[in-house]
Regions:
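Glycine-rich, charge-decorated loop segments at or immediately adjacent to ligand/cofactor-binding or catalytic sites
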Residues: 76-79, 147-157
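Alpha-helix initiation/capping motif
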Residues: 43, 144, 153, 221-223
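Substrate-binding cleft of extracellular glycoside hydrolase catalytic domains
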Residues: 2-135
């Protein structure tokens, strides 16, 4: 295994033993949940977690922090982006070592029972466009089943790259190639930064030879960095 690994964390995950996690150089950082819609924010928790990364000599070299917003489909996307940005600024803003923001686009927890392609694409685009104006960067779009079901496309949603969830041993469905699977998810290999291979809950999954638990954490959402260029590309994104 040569690809780097990054975990997703939110307040209900297991507590992290940060010295143990940071000592293993296979792990290149963490992406923290910061906000959800216009209703929830986790800035106090997020800042406490972030401080462990910022004080590491690895930070900005082979260790990065990232922040994600859980998008809600019944609230304006641009206002969600402004709220996300306000809380990110509150905990120190984007640093040289911070990955572009990630917007989580999925079905779970939504008040809209049957979202349409136009609705999801439009709200995500509003979020991404507003984030781009605030930060000068393009957001990463995280998604899986919903994007495939609706036929949503990364470019139409305004994302600069993708993070794809598929809990399987290989990055494709039965009888298709990776390229075909990513096309169904609205992206391509050149623009895919992360493959989320394991979740904190459910049966352990993932490709052969890759960990299904993180040191100092245990079961957690695990992402493999598959962005072409690997660490150098990730470092450039976080610069």
């Amino acid at each position: 295994m040569s690809d780097g690994l990054i975990v997703d964390l939110y307040p209900l995950d297991r507590p992290v033993d940060w010295p143990v996690y940071l000592a293993d150089r296979r792990w290149w950082g963490a992406i923290f949940k910061l906000t959800q819609g216009l209703d929830y924010e986790y800035s106090a928790w997020a800042k406490r977690q972030r401080d462990h990364l910022l004080t590491s000599p690895r930070y900005g070299v082979d260790l990065f922090d990232g922040w994600y917003h859980y998008l809600t489909f019944h609230q304006p996307g641009e206002i969600q982006a402004e709220r996300f940005w306000t809380y990110l600024e509150k905990i120190g803003g984007e640093r040289s070592g911070t990955l572009p923001a990630m917007v989580d686009v999925e079905r779970g927890g939504q008040r809209v029972a049957s979202p349409t392609k136009n609705q999801v694409t439009g709200i995500t685009r509003k979020f991404c466009d507003r984030y781009a104006k605030l930060s000068g960067r393009s957001a990463t779009i995280y998604g899986g089943e919903l994007l495939r079901a609706l036929g949503c496309k990364r470019e139409e949603m305004g994302g600069g790259r993708s993070a794809v969830a598929l809990y399987a041993s290989e990055l494709h469905g039965k009888g298709e190639s990776t390229a075909q699977f990513l096309a169904r998810t609205g992206t391509d290999l050149e623009h895919t930064m992360l493959w989320q291979t394991c979740a904190a809950e459910g049966a352990p999954t993932g490709p052969f030879g890759y960990p299904r638990e993180a040191p100092g954490i245990g079961r957690v959402d695990i992402n493999v960095v598959i962005l072409p260029g690997g660490l150098e590309s990730l470092r450039a994104l976080a610069g």
